[in-house]
Amino acid sequence: MNTRKTFAFVALCCCALWANAQKLTSPDGNLVMDFSLNQKGAPVYELTFKNKPVIKPSTLGLELKREDPEKRIGFEWTERKDKERVDEKMNLMTGFKVRETHTSTFDETWRPVWGEESEIRNHYNELEVTLDQPENDRYIVIRFRLFNDGLGFRYEFPQQPNLNYFVIKEEHTQFAMTGDHTAFWIPGDYDTQEYDYTTSRLSEIREKMKTAVTENSSQFVFSPTGVQTALMMKTDDGLYINLHEAALVDYACMSLNLDDKNMVFESWLTPDAKGDKGYMQTPCNSPWRTVIVSDDARNILASRITLNLNEPCKIEDTSWIHPVKYVGVWWDMITNKGTWAYTDELPSVKLGVTDYSQTKPNGKHSANTANVKRYIDFAAKHGFNAVLVEGWNQGWEDWFGKSKDYVFDFVTPYPDFDVQEIHRY
């Protein structure tokens, strides 16, 4: 290839990349998000704050679960290409082309039901990108909203013949960090968030994971570099970055898994017992993925991105909603001074069949009438608004570690808990 042809080829490539590129700026101009498609047709975004890189070029997409036809009786692949074609249909990561883009600006002030502020401003610039996947004759939408304090984006799946019902195998949303930041993190765990926070460099997460995973009654740590959101970080040049999500409805919770060689986080969804990470029916969308950023740590706490991206309140009469202080009949059980269970002599419980009146009380059941009255007296004397009572209803003997569909009876009290007397008192 001669020099002239080489130059022409490079120029054409640059033009093609430029044609796919879109830029979105926050209302105050401090944040800039760039969107493009790479050579594989994968969606890519990057984010800067006051000309400082926050998120390096990061890819977006999902991997769908393939229903294996080989498991069907009498089915055989006729050609290798048939299997490859099915695998390709599971790809919502590459092979995209930009069909159209729309930009808009939104600015409103709304009143929360309650909170730290009486009014919240919802001000952002939006980029809506419609992406066609010609190979599979389907399309998706990625919607970006850029606020003065951060970025929110989500996947949207319009209803269409070739994308109706689908199962999520993995979500491959990346957050590529610009360095080995200081992070304030807890282990990624499907079952609990009850961990102390660890402060370390991103590169130290793997090393410190063993000591960070303290004993808990129920836990499932999914990766030696997995962490939970919200994840807080600080860069060496003074930026504060928070990764989280908003509007989590009918979708799996997102944790983050770190590639600690390249300092790239990728979304990690919580699976069900089969390992599936989402059962979707179009039209539908993912939760918002959020990146809050500032050079002032106070602005991270003051950010209202999560509230602004959540759906508006649909409750018409909110007059009954107000904050309260309460005491609870549960801490003495956690400290082993009492129990949730009424008796210790039952090998198992069958709801509606087990007759607790014929069993021997263990003498340590905390949610009994006399003890709850004592808590009510304490709350009334010291200005608390309510008393939370755990362990009053039947079934707590089998509450943990049993493969059981129906553990609790939510209407029938233990023999030592008189609902009517508590109500009267």
Predicted features, each with a name:
Residues R121, R143, T282, S319, ...:
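Catalytic cores of large soluble enzymes that bind and process phosphate-bearing ligands
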Residues Y155, D296-R298, M333-N336, N393-W396:
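Solvent-exposed loop/turn segments at secondary-structure junctions
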Residues F184, L243, G328-W330, W340:
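Tryptophan-centered motif/residue detector
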